[in-house]
Curated annotation (Swiss-Prot):
Subunit structure: Heterodimer of a small subunit (PriS) and a large subunit (PriL).
Organism: Staphylothermus marinus (strain ATCC 43588 / DSM 3639 / JCM 9404 / F1)
Name under which the protein is recorded: DNA primase small subunit PriS
Active site: D99, D101, D274
Keywords attached to this entry: DNA replication, DNA-directed RNA polymerase, Magnesium, Manganese, Metal-binding, Nucleotidyltransferase, Primosome, Transcription, Transferase
Cofactor or coenzyme needed: Mg(2+); Mn(2+)
Gene3D superfamilies, per database record: DNA primase, PRIM domain (3.90.920.10)
Family indicated by similarity: Belongs to the eukaryotic-type primase small subunit family.
EC number in record: 2.7.7.-
GO cellular component terms, A-Z: DNA-directed RNA polymerase complex; primosome complex
Pfam families: DNA_primase_S, PriS_C
Entry's Gene Ontology BP terms: DNA replication, synthesis of primer
Enzyme class, spelled out: transferase
Length: 377
């Protein structure tokens, strides 16, 4: 390990332990029946099959033994969560989870590959730096407007689960990076198998939706469908959308909707759920109020509001400025919604959320953190 890597790791360990010393974690239901997993800062190991009788014991572990870059618990409940073999854990049931990433939306998937040793930046994702064959730093260019789109769909998932499927106790979490997790904490759905969970995800997302099965098409030359004022499920979803967006007159007893407009509506109502996550009954999920080691931001519960405006500062546990020494030359690098200029080897004062992010990525070296303050969580 180089001296700069050592100093950066010491800094990250210090701020993470200070943060967790304030006991911010949201305790999941029946923590003693959950598998706990940690991506350890000290040895960069991914440690699974941990179990703790209480959150107090978990705090003792992460404050004294292994500092978590990432901290997870299983969506599943087990009789013996610490057993290494999944088939011997004694599965009791699982929460229902949905995962949304903002890079799945049009115009939101731009990535830079930063080659530190080459002092070069490449558009797109590359596996190795061409000149040195070293591993590049992958830097997604995610804007707030993209995260806002993902939140909008997370809220839509919540409403569908409640209004169409009758489920309750649904929570929306910002992942701490670029997306959202929607969790259903309800014993009624614990025993759902993977195929049943996939069916729910497909119903919500409209993945591979066959219009003809639910909307009989009328006409030969000018094709259309009929929607009445008394609809349920997906048909009501379409009805509400076309009325809300003034696509049709909502005062009529029934709506004659051209097939082309129906197809456009279905496309707009499609939600890019990661169905693999929903199907996985042993999926790991980030602790509420834990730090996401990719960004330095908090995985945080969000109040479900139609008028919610995403603000990255609401998820940053640090305040103040940090002095860093950049390891690369770059002008106008987008970090969150800000653009910064970096000159290799020239000290620069950065806002803490930018500095922590760049430190986690290995793009800068920490020089002084005297002005850094941990916010009240």
């Amino acid at each position: 390990m180089s001296r700069q890597e050592s100093s950066n790791k010491f800094f990250i360990k210090k701020i993470l332990r200070e943060y967790y010393s304030r006991k911010p974690l949201e305790e999941p239901l029946y923590i003693h029946k959950r598998e706990i997993a940690i991506h350890s800062l000290e040895d960069e190991a991914y440690i699974r099959h941990l179990s703790f009788p209480s959150i107090t014991h978990l705090y003792n572990f992460i404050l004294n033994e292994k500092t978590p870059l990432h901290l997870y618990y299983s969506s599943a409940y087990y009789e013996s969560p610490s057993v290494n073999k999944m088939e011997l854990k004694g599965w009791i049931g699982s929460d229902l989870m949905f995962d949304l990433d903002s890079d799945h939306y049009p115009g939101c998937d731009k990535i830079l590959s930063i080659c530190i040793e080459e002092n070069t930046i490449y558009d797109g994702k590359i596996k190795t730096c061409p000149k040195t064959e070293s591993k590049p730093v992958i830097h997604p260019l995610i804007k707030t407007e993209c995260i806002q789109k993902a939140y909008r769909d997370a809220l839509r998932i919540k409403y569908i689960l409640e209004d169409e499927l009758g489920l309750k106790n649904i929570k929306i979490y910002f992942s701490g990076n670029r997306g959202f997790h929607v969790k259903v904490i309800d014993e009624k759905i614990w025993d759902l198998e993977s195929d049943e969970r996939r069916e729910i995800a497909s119903y919500i997302s409209l993945e591979n939706f066959d219009i003809n099965k639910l909307f009989p098409v009328i006409g030969k030359r000018k094709k259309y469908v009929i929607i009445t004022r008394n609809e349920h499920g997906i048909r009501k979803r379409v009805l509400d959308y076309v009325i809300k967006n003034n696509i049709v007159n909502g005062n009529e007893l029934f709506i004659k909707l051209p097939l082309k407009l129906l197809e456009e509506t279905i496309n707009d109502l499609t939600i890019p759920i990661d169905i693999v996550v929903t199907m996985d009954i042993s999926r790991l999920s980030r602790f509420g109020n834990s730090i996401n080691g990719k960004s330095g931001l908090i995985t945080k519960l969000i109040e479900p509001l139609d008028n919610y405006e995403f603000d990255i500062n609401d998820f940053c546990p640090w305040s103040g400025n940090i002095v860093v020494k950049p390891l690369i030359d770059i002008s106008g690098l987008q970090v969150f919604d800000e653009k910064i200029d970096l000159k290799r080897g020239v000290k620069k004062i950065l806002d803490s959320k930018i500095a922590v992010y760049l430190t986690l990525k290995g793009i800068v070296k920490i020089i002084s953190d005297e002005k850094l303050v941990i916010k009240n969580v």
